[in-house]
Amino acid sequence: MKYEISEQAKLPTRFGNFFTKSFREYGKNNTLFEHLVVFTHTLGETPLVRIHSECLTGDVFGSKKCDCGNELALAMEQIAHNTEGGMLIYLRQEGRGIGLFNKINAYALQDKGYDTVEANQQLGFAGDMRSYEIVGEIFKHFHITHINLLTNNPRKIDALAPYAKVVRHSIITPSNPHNQAYLEVKKQKLGHLL
């Protein structure tokens, strides 16, 4: 895997003061992903970690179709106040790895009655196309071998097992009428622990 690491910069946020680095990943077929790591000044032996895949509609625009924006905010708040410190790894894998353009097309199919997994399949994609290999490199860079992982996704736990000893912590946010069916599909078809 080829990647490069930016310089470290301060990142004051509404949740607290953090530091940040970007990992530029050179993927297959000349793809380029610029991931962001937001972390506390001190990282203890077992930091609190959230692996968060980009969701422009939820994270930036506050879409109620998913739980992403709420999970991002809750994770940042918990990391900021965790005694062992922590980090949020923001992976540029929009739409569970299918990209923004295809995600919007999947949304259009959802408007016609397909669920989130069926919509991806109609577009020729699996239900989840994400890769977590870069996370292993990020953990190496920060000398992380044990983590408390904020996730409801068992696939993330399995994917990170080669890189660190993982203890899962749920991240539960309130549902709303727009995302209840979506959350049920994540539970039933993607195995999320909700």
UniProtKB/Swiss-Prot annotation:
GO terms under biological process: riboflavin biosynthetic process
Residues that hold GTP according to the record: R50, I51, H52, S53, E54, E94, G95, R96, T116, T151, K156
GO CC annotations, alphabetized: cytosol
Protein family: Belongs to the GTP cyclohydrolase II family.
Cofactor note: Binds 1 zinc ion per subunit.
Keyword annotations: GTP-binding, Hydrolase, Metal-binding, Nucleotide-binding, Riboflavin biosynthesis, Zinc
Superkingdom of the source species: Bacteria
Pfam family, one: GTP_cyclohydro2
Protein name, UniProt field: GTP cyclohydrolase-2
Residues annotated as catalytic: D128, R130
NCBIfam families noted in UniProt: PRK00393.1, ribA
Molecular-function annotations in GO: GTP binding; GTP cyclohydrolase II activity; zinc ion binding
Pathway assignment: Cofactor biosynthesis; riboflavin biosynthesis; 5-amino-6-(D-ribitylamino)uracil from GTP: step 1/4
Record function comment: Catalyzes the conversion of GTP to 2,5-diamino-6-ribosylamino-4(3H)-pyrimidinone 5'-phosphate (DARP), formate and pyrophosphate.
The enzyme's E.C. designation: 3.5.4.25
Lineage: Bacteria, Pseudomonadati, Campylobacterota, Epsilonproteobacteria, Campylobacterales
Source organism per UniProt: Helicobacter hepaticus (strain ATCC 51449 / 3B1)
Cofactor: Zn(2+)
